[in-house]
Amino acid sequence: ERSHYTHLTLLAKNNTGYRNLLKLASFAATEGMYYNPTIDINILREYSEGLICLSGCFSGLIPKLLRAGERDKAEEWAKKFHEIFGEDFYLEVQKHPITKWSEIPRIRAEQEKFAEGQRIIYEGLSHISNKLGIPMVATNDVHYMTQDQSDLHDIYLAVGDGKKVFDESRRRYSTDQFYFKSEKEMLELFPADVVHRTLEIAEKCNVVIEELENPKPLMPH
């Protein structure tokens, strides 16, 4: 349903993929707009050539199904994506440890829910990977560059929602781990082959964006 949108990671392998990515983005922002830009599986299939697909973050379709206890449905969607993208589909695994537990009951409950959700997702994706032979790749859900910017990001969230920083009911992230981690940090969280699969994906991406002779948009008279 359009009201239950989820996240998906798409990367361009080549110029065909780049053009298809632009088409998908344009469709999502126009015909697919429903509070947020969206696409459905049929449009994704139509413009899938030249694209690499990762299953998404905590809010991805497959992770959401796993958190809801619907592993069979999660497997079915993994099969669908694998049918569309073949060897260019990867199960995206993430770990964002809770480094500081809140003493505020409401916030701590959210942290506990997030931590348990991550555990369920990782176990579920590992099971699907082993069962279907779909490779996993480790990523980090990056929202700021360095760990010490987490407080600024928290303020940004409060300002964006028009609420006070100390408002317990406002939107917030459960940990300060949503930053750009080093290879060493990622290897402390995941098996080496899962981390280094990012290099395999990077080597697949060979987009060459040609410089336009006249980059100015054409305006109707």
Locate each region found by the language model.
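Phosphodiester-processing cores and adjacent nucleic acid-binding clamps
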Residues: 1-221
